[in-house]
From Swiss-Prot:
One of its GO terms (biological process) is proteolysis. This is Pyrrolidone-carboxylate peptidase. It is found in: Cytoplasm. Its main location: cytoplasm.
């Protein structure tokens, strides 16, 4: 059975939970549409997260990678189109604040997702789940891991589909914030649908 590496993140900033962590834990070792899910929760740390992801790619040897991130405030599932070679944003969980430096000093300006993002959006909408392609993954850890995975695949000429999907807040996370939210089970179902779009 083909393997898919599914990653999420631990809680960060002022978020007490991270629904991507729950999705990854919920799908770990499960079979989804012929794919064996290998789930991994990543730290929110600019200095170690990218290297850890690269190590996982070579250890797991997946045929596909979907990385997940929380975009609290968005009101739909948003597969990302592009990752840019830039670290920026608020502090990570170790207190480090990037200031626009490159992720890879001699790397290209950006990489496009190799996931079937249009198909994913269509299938999500066909299942009654709001979805839209996003043209910016930001410059925080979400963009960082998307870029690092795609860069490693390009440099090593690996035959791996890879990309990133941002999800809205879960209801539990929205209890203390006035933001759009989904039921956790619907967020997980959305990712299962996205996995089902892979050939």
């Amino acid at each position: 059975m083909k393997k898919i590496l599914l990653t999420g993140f631990v809680p960060f900033l002022d978020n007490p939970i991270n629904p991507t962590e729950e999705i990854v834990q919920g799908l770990h070792k499960k079979s989804v549409n012929g794919w064996e899910v290998v789930g991994e929760v990543l730290p929110v740390d600019f200095h170690v997260t990218g290297d850890h992801l690269v190590e996982l790619i070579h250890k797991v040897q997946p045929s596909a990678i979907i990385s997940l991130g929380l975009a609290a405030g968005r009101n739909r599932i948003t597969p990302e189109r592009i990752a840019i070679n830039c670290n920026d944003g608020p502090v990570d969980n170790q207190g480090y604040k990037p200031d626009g430096e490159k992720i890879i000093s001699d790397g290209p300006d950006g990489y496009f997702s190799s996931l079937p993002i249009k198909k994913m959006v269509k299938e999500l909408e066909n299942n009654g789940i709001p979805a839209k392609i996003s043209n910016t993954a930001g410059a925080y850890l979400c963009n960082h891991v998307m870029y690092r995975a795609l860069h490693e695949i390009e440099q090593q000429k690996l035959d791996i589909f890879s990309g990133f999907i941002h999800i809205p807040a879960s209801h539990k996370l929205a209890l203390t914030n006035n933001i759009p939210s989904f039921a956790q089970k619907d967020l997980q179902r959305a990712i299962e649908i996205c996995i089902g779009c892979l050939d």
